[in-house]
Structure formats: structure tokens, C-alpha cells
């Protein structure tokens, strides 16, 4: 049995869970998220706890039990506290600002890069060189952060580019004669 899958999920106050027609939906103060449940996994909701069990003894069912439990835990955390990812812009003239719901980036190109935010994801710019991406869906928040970083990833010689706030860029030495 999966060690991750065995652990129950405690539901905090304000989080409601529904299991209907093979879909797990979690509702909370920050919104509603839903995820289809695989047929090899059984879900039980009782007394503010959510538990998962494999439908049979196959190896695939054990693996999917842990996967479903991890996805559900992320959904519960997302609708109650939310997720955020911080990005830093390092480089002369690199700036970010909000333009409505879109993010306008000046990254050394001859044009400004405008990144539209998907449904359920918000961006903040506390300073011109800092971006905070927030949302209830962990996968969407991470995907948007990766897309913004991909416009100008940190280069290995000076470290200029868009990087995660907790990312360490290892700088190379230049060639010497």
C-alpha cells in the first residue's frame, strides 16, 4: 500500500468535499476545484476527514491511491489558503507591471511581452522587479510561473533573466586566455 495514500486528509473549517459521479470536488473560501477520480481508487468522506483506498490489490491501484491523495490534499490547501509563486527579474531595464488582468514584461526585447493570466490565477507586482503569482490551483500557478520564467530564463554567465525567488543560479566563469 502507498504510504502517502494511507494518510488521511483533515478537512479544515470552510472546506466542503463532495464525491459524485466519479468526480471529487472541493469548495472553500477561495473557490471550487474538481478532479475526476480514477476507477481503481475508492474515496471516503467522514467526520471532516478524507481517506483513499485502492479498489483492488494491483500495483497500479496502489500508485494511483497515493497520486489521488496528493492531488486532493493540494485541492484542499488551495481552496483554503491558496498557493503562490514568487519570481524575481534580474537585469538592467527588466520590469514588470500589471495591465488589467495581464502582466506586461520588459525583458530586453525590442517589444514588451504581455502574458494573459488564466482563469483563477492572479498576479501582483509589489515592486517593478518582483512578481507574485497566486491562485487556488497549484498546477495552474506553477504552470503560469514556468511560462513567465520561460520568456527569459536566467543565463549562466551573469544570471540575468526571470528566476524563482528560491532559485539559485550557478554562474559559470568566462573563458580566459
Curated annotation (Swiss-Prot):
GO terms for biological process: cytoplasmic translation. It holds the Pfam family Ribosomal_L6. InterPro entries: Ribosomal_uL6-like, Ribosomal_uL6-like_a/b-dom_sf, Ribosomal_uL6_a/b-dom, Ribosomal_uL6_bac-type, Ribosomal_uL6_CS. One of its GO terms (molecular function) is structural constituent of ribosome. PROSITE patterns: RIBOSOMAL_L6_1 (PS00525). The keyword Glycosyltransferase does not apply. It comes from the Bacteria. Belongs to the universal ribosomal protein uL6 family. Part of the 50S ribosomal subunit. NCBIfam families: L6_bact. This is Large ribosomal subunit protein uL6. It comes from Cupriavidus pinatubonensis (strain JMP 134 / LMG 1197). The gene is rplF.
